[in-house]
Amino acid sequence: MEETTLLRLENVDICREENVILHNASFVLKNGEFVYVIGKVGSGKSSLLKSLYCEIPIMNGDAFLMEYNLCKIKRKEIPYLRRKLGIVFQDFQLLTDRSVIKNLEFVLKATGWKNKEQIAERIDNVLVQVGMQNKGYKMPHELSGGEQQRIVIARALLNDPKLILADEPTGNLDPETSGQILQLLHDISRRGTSVVMTTHNYTLVHN
């Protein structure tokens, strides 16, 4: 791939069991680019993102993400690919039994961070990036939906990913909060991180 190209899909088929979800799909994503994947509910948007972090296989065509060939990637390589990605889920998937800081600390320790000072510094850094520096000791249930989504984005930023995959990140939020989350993702993209965001909300994208 060209040096500025982060992701290239060419004529790929994405299947779940024997069902073809997407057929003959192609697109290119460059470093620092923000791309919307827009479509109706059930049109395969989430499956496309899942194929990029190797939860769903790509059956045909060519697919390259960074230095990885997604059609031929080995199982042992998948964790290393995923560490270079930040994933933002619509339903947050925060650990409800621990604080924001402990949620973020859990991810860092799971991905190999050991130094307590470096862990604390990194958590402070990402919370500032998403405007949640005063919420670190809150439990998830004490946060609004928009605040929880900001924490999810902070979690996605922890390992300084080259690409953020945001799956309907505004799907459960009111219009004003959705606009704020969208602005935050654009700010992150302007700092050099590529973003692929799925949505069924044409109005949100148009605005």
Predicted regions and their residues:
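A short, proline-enriched helix->beta-strand linker immediately N-terminal to the Walker B motif
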Residues: 158-162
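Short coil-to-helix segment of the ABC ATPase nucleotide-binding domain corresponding to the Q-loop/switch region
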Residues: 98-106
